[in-house]
Amino acid sequence: MSSLDAYFRDVTHHEFVLDTALRTQKLDDVDKDTCNCPIPELLELAPLIIAQKDFSYAYLSNTLVLTLQDAEYYPQGSSNPTHLCLLFNATDRNGSTTVLRNPKRQTRRKIEPDHKDGEGYEFSSHILISLSGQKRTYKAVISRAPKISTNLIELFFNKILFQISRANTEKFSINAKTNATDTSTGKTKKVLYKPVAELRGTLDIELFNKMNSGGLSEVT
């Protein structure tokens, strides 16, 4: 993409920490206190995430649209994949004028954006998440891109997880502990929940070791 450096991409290291949260709003305090929603593993969620390809959601007053452009296991075609690879695309409908300069001729030329029917400049970010985690925590690396902040990645990933819970209500529901009956169905009331994820930054182990063993030992 023309607005990015053609020779390198910044990559940051992170952790995805999985948990669950209630979707059902009207619950007795007893059910809220005793509800124990099982936390799915990423390996279990991976095929459901892949099924959400092409899902989009708008942010920043509808000026930035994030899309799950692609989602695949890595290595591709492996019977025992080790990672989940996601491609997030961002369409920026609020792009500014681009200036092209010719140093030889000492001229500048403006390229005015002409957005039609929701068009915008597009950026992309790859996310590689390990499928083997410990204590609900999964290592990940993210290729950085303009407009796609860590906070937006976390928000969009959780929006995808929410869509998964809506599309798979039987999988993400448990019986209420009080065994209350739903008056509309006559069946035991179900408590709906959703998987959620927190995106955390991680310590650079190489830098940490240098800080403790060499010339950076006084840095805190």
Predicted regions mapped to residue ranges:
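Terminal interaction module
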Residues: 1-105, 147-220
